[in-house]
Amino acid sequence: FEYQSKEAFREKGLPTPKGVLVRGMDELDGAFAEVGFPCVLKSQVLSGGRGKAGLIKVVKDAESAKATAKTLFESEHNVRMLLVEEAVDIDREIYLSITVDPVESKIMLIGCAEGGVEIEKLAATDPDKIVTVRVDIAEGLGGYHVNNLTYGMGLSGDLGKQVGAVVRGLYKTFRAYDAQLAEINPLFITKDGKACLLYTSP
């Protein structure tokens, strides 16, 4: 479930919006008090395409939120849990991933200042926009690896530090699960300059 993915991300230091899991209508008031309005009601179901199915809704006040929650709980999709999550004001998106270079047997950090894109298409049409940094597996991730990636993406100052922290968290996740690919597409940057993961699968 999405809420479990986000808990795992937070444990590795990856930033996610404030959220409260509710299992019934009686838990909504407490969640709204903690998260505030506007907020997003996200049905926790093990299927993709939740947005298109109408299972993710933005609500602006308690009255409309409760009516929406009731509709979601009573829907045909067998919704038993809702993640009540703060709504964020998005300014831009960036792309981050970590994978293994099978030829050199090194870990590759990949970043692009344009997120929400198909990275394979961008690699074919505009490869200069993609920044790649290789990390020796035995050596591990160093500060200069992270700096080379963020500077290469044109990120500096506080935002560069935040994205650098996300890269470190993603690297920890990648190594902890012995993964072949760890990807954030997109990492959202809010209008007040905060990096944030909004979506996880499912």
Feature roles, as predicted:
Residues 1-26, 33, 37-38:
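Preference for protein termini
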Residues 3-9, 35-51, 77-91, 96, ...:
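ATP-grasp fold ATP-binding core
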Residues 16-19, 41-68, 95, 117-119:
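Glycine-rich phosphate-binding loop of ATP-grasp-fold ATP-dependent ligases
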Residues 71-75:
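Catalytic core of tubulin tyrosine ligase-like
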Residues 99-149:
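Flexible glycine-/small-residue-enriched beta->alpha junction loops
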Residues 145-187:
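A long amphipathic alpha-helix within ATP-dependent nucleotide-binding catalytic cores
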Residues 194-195:
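Conserved protein kinase catalytic/activation segment
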Residues 199-202:
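Conserved small/polar residues in nucleotide/adenosyl-binding loops
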